[in-house]
Amino acid sequence: MALYEMNLSVILFLIGILGFVLNRKNIILMLISIEVMLLAVTLLVLVSSYSFDDILGQTYSIYIIAIAGAESAIGLGILVAYYRLRGNISLRQ
């Protein structure tokens, strides 16, 4: 049963990598792709924790989600400062 969830996690991670590589112009889409990759890893940690009947993986996933939230807040703060400085958020001008 856990094999389906692990495959889903790998597919989500590959979608995140693909989104990051293909959207090199838009910073917001790059941040979203990084978040998708991080949440795919979190899903893999949760599934592995459930498979091995270990609660430590669940606590790690809570930490990963908290760090992802902080990373998103910092990234969006930097993005707002970049927009105020340059007037647009495009990487290529």
Swiss-Prot record:
Instruction: List the membrane topology term(s).
Output: Multi-pass membrane protein
- For whether the record's keyword set contains NAD, the answer is yes
The record's EC number reads 7.1.1.2
What keywords would UniProt list here?
Answer: Electron transport, Membrane, Mitochondrion, Mitochondrion inner membrane, NAD, Respiratory chain, Translocase, Transmembrane, Transmembrane helix, Transport, Ubiquinone
Q: Which Pfam families match?
A: Oxidored_q2 (PF00420)
CC annotations in GO: mitochondrial inner membrane; respiratory chain complex I
Q: Which reaction does it catalyse?
A: a ubiquinone + NADH + 5 H(+)(in) = a ubiquinol + NAD(+) + 4 H(+)(out)
Main localisation: mitochondrion
Keyword set includes Translocase: yes
Q: Which GO terms describe its molecular function?
A: NADH dehydrogenase (ubiquinone) activity
Listed transmembrane segments:
2-22, 27-47, 62-82
Q: Name one GO biological process term.
A: ATP synthesis coupled electron transport
- Places the protein is found: Mitochondrion inner membrane
| Family per record | Belongs to the complex I subunit 4L family.
In terms of NCBIfam families, this protein maps to:
PRK05715.1-2
Q: What does this protein do?
A: Core subunit of the mitochondrial membrane respiratory chain NADH dehydrogenase (Complex I) that is believed to belong to the minimal assembly required for catalysis. Complex I functions in the transfer of electrons from NADH to the respiratory chain. The immediate electron acceptor for the enzyme is believed to be ubiquinone.
**Which HAMAP family does the entry link to?**
NDH1_NuoK
Descriptive protein name: NADH-ubiquinone oxidoreductase chain 4L
Q: Which organism is it from?
A: Mycosarcoma maydis
